């Protein structure tokens, strides 16, 4: 099987819930990171406790964020993509930033 025939399951942002793609730009420590979102806004994002020790996030990772409803320059991380998933998203045209 070629790499194009491989089946990859990829979670996409739920636009009804306000989820956006983002790229990690810097690590700030204490479970906080800077994320450049697909709408062009740089947000201070929080890594929730359920993800802290299970999923390690580094600079350059593609993530899904949910902006806070009362403070638009802040967000929560809900998902981190692996490298094969990012390649698939780029090939299919989902990542445009």
From Swiss-Prot:
InterPro entries: NA-bd_OB-fold, RNA-binding_domain_S1_IF1, TIF_eIF-1A, TIF_eIF-1A_CS. Pfam families: eIF-1a (PF01176). Keywords: Initiation factor, Protein biosynthesis. The keyword Membrane does not apply. Transmembrane segments: none annotated. The keyword ATP-binding does not apply. Residues 8-82 form the S1-like domain. One of its GO terms (molecular function) is RNA binding. Belongs to the eIF-1A family. PANTHER family: EIF-1A. Seems to be required for maximal rate of protein biosynthesis. Enhances ribosome dissociation into subunits and stabilizes the binding of the initiator Met-tRNA(I) to 40 S ribosomal subunits. This is Translation initiation factor 1A. The gene is eIF1A.
